[in-house]
From Swiss-Prot:
The keyword Cytoplasm applies. This is Adenylosuccinate synthetase. Mg(2+) binds at residues 12, 39. It catalyses: IMP + L-aspartate + GTP = N(6)-(1,2-dicarboxyethyl)-AMP + GDP + phosphate + 2 H(+). The gene is purA. It comes from the Archaea. Pathway: Purine metabolism; AMP biosynthesis via de novo pathway; AMP from IMP: step 1/2. IMP binds at residues 12-15, 37-40, 124, 138, 220, 235, 299.
Amino acid sequence: MFTIITGAQFGDEGKGKIVDLLAEKYDIIARFQGGDNAGHTVKVGDKTYKLHLVPSGVLFDKRLLIGPGVVLNPKVLWEELQTLWGMGMKVDLGIDPKTSIIMPYHIEMDALREKARTAKIGTTRRGIGYAYIDKIAREEVQMADITDPEMLKRKLEEIAPAKESAIKEMGGDPSVVRDEAQLRAYLEIGRALKNNLTDVSLEINRALDEDKMVLAEGAQGAFLDVIHGTQKFVTSSFTTAGSACANLGVGPVRVDNVVGVVKAYITRVGEGPMPTELKDEIGDRLREAGGEYGTTTGRPRRCGWFDAVLGRKAVYLNGYTELALTKLDVLTGLRRIKICVAYELDGEILEYPPESTYELARCVPVYEEMEGWSESISEALDYSDLPQNARAYVERIQELMDVDIAAISVGPAREQTIYME
């Protein structure tokens, strides 16, 4: 069985917890895009694990794969592995040799470019975009290259002059391109991980041939997709379910399930339009109650009411077969709760978002109001344990999305999850 899991909003939907819940049933968990600009948090008992590159299934001693659609900072991965090993965890990790490497010059160029912008886009300055540019331009350093000094030397002889020139023009220090200490550190990590190299496409397809269970884990969310997101305020990779097939080298006919993770409200970190954003005390309350600060950057997330207009588009973009609704507990205590069911733009009612980011920024949300609930739901074990108003809210979201909700998260811990029949 091949299952894909993606975020249905702007990222930070709680995918880490949902993957962690599913991982126990799967043999392989594979990351298919993004880099360490995305973070996911998993809570088990009194321990919290913050991961950026290692797939969430690490807590169950599963086979973990990083596919060639990922851009990888070796130092970040190595630090994560050291932390996990220090906790006594076994990490059975495979990395595709074609995985693009985020080089120090990518990080430098990212910071210089963002500094020069008159209008910021909110990059994490981790070199993600520039690493993807090099992938498309066929000027990338790949994982295989940092396992062999001669391979890396030849690659840099080819691409370094242009990088040095570009950084100099941007006002930076071009010496970062061939910094010997940095390159030596990369090569040491590459040699240490050489035995972890694997053909990810081959491994997954063979596993599926043997009727094994494979879970493809996405990063970010639908509206950060480089094509279908809110350009230019997006990430540099393809975040929707279709990219799992392309990036992992698995034919689309092999997909069995696509799980969308959606928060009971909506958040966004960085710049870009978000029609239901709450710039008031309710937005502040959601941020504090939900702990809405970036796993990677620590930046406060912008919070807003649930947006079913974007939700409907996310369903189309991903082909969801089921949904996981997270952070329902954060809404506890609100007297009235709103759901955006349409937009108004220049006097016209829209039930589907406009393609233009400029027009989306001008959309005014059309809301339905629902009664809130005051009872704590964090210890609810069954759907019937939820207050009537909470159930009504869940059912309205399911109706608007037109996809069954299979699980509801009522707290950060694994056991704080309600499974629907």
